[in-house]
Amino acid sequence: MTSGAPDLLIDAGNSRIKWALVTADGSQIAAGALPHSGADQPDWSDLPTPCRAWLSNVAGENVAARIAASLDARWPQLPLTTIRACAQQCGVTNSYTTPQALGSDRWAGMIGAHAAFLGEHLLIATFGTATTLEALRADGCFVGGLIAPGWSLMMRSLGEHTAQLPTLDAHAARGLLDGSIAAAGRSGPFFATDTPRSLSAGCTLAQAGLVERMWRDLQDEWQVPVRLVVSGGAVDEVASALKVPHTRHDSLVLSGLALIAAERALERGN
């Protein structure tokens, strides 16, 4: 392995694993994703040997062990760095009371967003298993955030903890929405006329309402424009219900991992 070899970036979220092989300048050589469910392994068979692997893992020890085994099977003894949030990195300052308690995915995502929209105040909304919000000032100061149940989790919880409501999965709920909320938003409030649509639309609008409320509150507090950046597995559904301007970015965590890798390489003198 040479200093010019690419980095392998791995984002292990609660529902799936995303990865990318990138060069030192951030150019992507290859990328992929796979769910935690099932026995599938990442297809790294045709990839060149990376200099190091970088992992953000919020999915637990079993997933970490699975990733380590996959790496060792393809590239024995490849160095693996599992990132943790810290007080300051890549121009972002962490205001959490205990900086290391912040999820590594949120930390890497903020680093990626700060670099992608340099000089802008941001509200970052990620719609995954959990919905997370981060308020990030233009100077890189993360002032705090929120965590709520994600879109799919909201629907599943209602089905599992009530006697008569159906348990909707994401696939079924997407079919029920079918652009109806966005269309209704142009003509008036949306009220469904059957239980499954009431549930799917209600959870979608709950997500959108949270984001819109915090975006408006943040602009009122800071008295400056704030860019709303959205991402995550349920971004299509929730973004369709938003009535405020927003920008989509699908690779914030991987982008942040690339920046962390580059900063560490400079520190090592590579």
UniProtKB/Swiss-Prot annotation:
ATP binds at D11, A12, G13, N14, S15, R16, I17, K18, T129. CDD domains: ASKHA_NBD_PanK-III. It is found in: Cytoplasm. Its cofactor is NH4(+); K(+). Substrate binds at Y96, G103, S104, D105, R106, T195. One of its GO terms (molecular function) is pantothenate kinase activity. This is Type III pantothenate kinase. The gene is coaX.
